[in-house]
Amino acid sequence: SEAVESHVPGSVWKLEVKPGQGVKRGKTLLVVESMKMEIAVEAPDDGVVVELLVAEGHPVAPGQRVAVLESEASK
């Protein structure tokens, strides 16, 4: 499994996926609102969302783990 991190500080504005959902590389997992901008956190590889570590409205810091993916490459 692979941790996905936020690259910016802010708060989780919207979750775009659910645990167990298959995703393709580049798919938006969630959106972080930072300084009135919406920044997408994207899947780094094709895979399945194992766990979301944040909820809508939660604050996030740069480098904070926000999701766990099981990538197709690691199977």
Regions found by a protein language model. Name each.
Residues 1-31, 40-46, 53, 75:
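Acidic, low-complexity mobile loops and tails
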Residues 20-29, 34, 57-69:
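A structural signal for short beta-strand/turn segments enriched in small hydrophobics and glycine
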Residues 37, 71-72:
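Short, ordered loop/turn segments at secondary-structure junctions
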Residues 50-52, 59:
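A general structural signal for short secondary-structure boundary/capping elements
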Residues 59, 74-75:
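Short alpha-helical boundary/capping segments at helix-coil junctions
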